[in-house]
Every structure is written in C-alpha cells, then in structure tokens.
Amino acid sequence: MDAEFVTNFDALYIIIFQIIVSSVVMRMKPLKSMISGFLVCSIGMALTLFSQNVLFTLVAILIFSLGEMAGSPKITEYIGRIAPHDKKALYMGYSFIPVFIGNVFAGIISGVVYQNMADKVMITRQFVAEKGLHLPDGLSNNAYFEHVAQQVNLTPHELTNLLWNEYSPSNIWMVILAIGLGTTLLLYIYDRVINKTKR
C-alpha cells in the first residue's frame, strides 16, 4: 500500500468520526479537551513511527485522528472565550502567531533531527560508507537505493528491513512523543497555575 494512500486515512477517519467525537467533547471545557486531545494525538503520532506494519499504522493514525478531532476545534472555542467581546477578531488573528513560529522552527529543527535519526537516504549512505561500497555519481535517491540493494544481493524491500533492524529509525517516535507530552504538560500547568490565578 502506497504511503500517500495511507496518509489519506486521517481525513477518512475525521469524516467518519468527527460528529461522534464532537458530541463527546462538547461537554468538556476547552482546555481539558485540548489537553486530552493533544495527549492522544502525541501517542498516535508516535505509534505511526513505531512499526512498518500497515495495519498497525492505520490504527495509530486512527488514534492520532481521534486526538486531533478532540483538541483542534476547541482551540478556536477557547480563544473566543478568553477574548474581550470587542476584540475577538484580533485575538483570533494573534492565535495564529504560535502556528507561524511553530512552522518556521519545525522546518529547521525537525529536518535536522529527522535526517540524523530516520531519513532513509542518510541511513543508506551511512550503510554504504560502513560496508565500503562504491556507487556511481549522479544517481537519484531511488536509483541509489536500488544499486545498494544489488551490491549486497538483496531486494529493495529486504534492504529496507535490514536498515530498519540495524539502524532503528523508528526511535524517532520517542522524540515525537516527548514533544507531545511536553506540550500537554505545559497546557496542564497553564490550566492549573496561570489560568487559575485569572479566574
């Protein structure tokens, strides 16, 4: 099953389950729903990187989607609640500043982390260097990978499994989970400490 097809299951799950999830979380306070949603999201996202098994990944995407459905809509509701009546539009606009900052730094930080821990091309190049293999220059990533597989008498699928077992790129799930748990913890502290003083 193609990776592009598998990622579409997130949208499918949202179409199927959004009304059910919304009916459950609508009774919850926005921050409680956001904390719960982001926690479930983090677990789901981490699990998608834990295994190569497609069915396992589909279940992990479902977990992620449920968290996304529980947490994301409540962000807008929370902004609407804390904003003064005459400044709701201004607050809504400002609420996208963290998203902008996150997108900028995520590209810089996550790219380096992913490349060092889980990028298939980088892992393959490391494997080539360790084995002392020699390959022609100017190959595309796919052609490079196929040439490496040929030189070690493996199919591309077998080489993928070998790299997965030897270099453990799935360990990046720990980074994803740590970020998610950190975010959830900060929201919890905000709810219990900072937000409590404003009530």
Describe each PLM feature range.
Residues 32-47:
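Structural signature of the two symmetry-related core transmembrane helices
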Residues 55-71:
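Hydrophobic core of transmembrane alpha-helices in multi-pass small-molecule transporters
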Residues 100-120:
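A gly/Pro-rich, aromatic-decorated transmembrane alpha-helix motif that marks the paired
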